[in-house]
Amino acid sequence: MAFAIATAASFPEVTLAAPTPAPADSNALVRAALEAPRHVSYVGQIQTIRWGMRNANATIQRVEHLAPSSTRRTFLAPEALYGEYDITLGTTTTKIDPKQHRAMISENPSSDNAITMNTNIVLLAANYRAVVGPVEIVAGRPATTVSLVNRFTGERMMRLWIDNSTKVVLAKEAYHQDGSLAWRSRFDEIRFTGEIPSGVFATAIPQGFQEVEGRRFGDMSDDLQRTLDEAGFKAVNPRYLPDGFKIIGAENSSFRGLRNLHLLYSDGIRTLSLFENNADSEPDFGGVKPSTTHFEGHDAEYVKDGPTTLLTWREHGLAFALIGDLDLKKLTAIAISVIP
């Protein structure tokens, strides 16, 4: 079984008086924010902090985005990542690591999949209340705050700062179920312009760099039965999902020569992926040392990275990996319901 976990200072906030939109306007504002990157180009610097179990990790990146779907992110800090960058053109991402002289190319058609985006928007409206707050200043620009409150638990799961003019999200915070902060991203500065040199998005691999195979996702399909039939083994769907989660797509992907069935679930904000394969291979935790756990007579391993948890186990000749923005208790409950 092979998989990878993908991961990403506080500033004073000035509050201005502003009228509070009606609920219908709140939902329209969130949808506009989701769609803004398809229409708005910009250059800026963004800071991200992720809180783990023992410490916090902070990064600073220069972001250059040319609508609708070209983005370059270059690490400025910490020093260990300085100079690394990735370029996403549509559904293809090229990651360049100058220190290791290594390049990785990944393919994910679902990143530009209208089915996935529209389904998430519907789930977001069904499972979360968009509560508009005051206007605050982010990167020198007025931005409307919107809290996304889970309808089942009453907990705020995410807060957005949406630029009043362009509707681009200038800052974002995500929270654990206990209300503690999981991660925060915030533009220190941003300039809206479409005049970005084409060379910024050049993806030619530098001479002498080793090309490492990245993950090659298939096109996420809403034809679940066809995807299951093409998996090559009898696939299993979980019998339990947390409130609000629905399956939004499935695909058969390949990574390092290993074929995986990928089932994708979402509640509009949080995502959950279940990977299955029938290969006799060891999990790849990307250099992170896993912890062990047990359930229903199974030995399992897991790792946590901020709000994201990854749980792996084997059963009846199948290898399973669950990864999502949920705690171990919730993932274990889902795993117990996966019965081959």
Q: Where do the PLM segments sit?
A:
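Surface-exposed amphipathic alpha-helical segments
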Residues: 166-168, 175, 179-199, 316-340
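Short amphipathic beta-strand/extended segments with alternating polar/hydrophobic composition
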Residues: 58-62, 84-89, 104-110, 185-187, ...
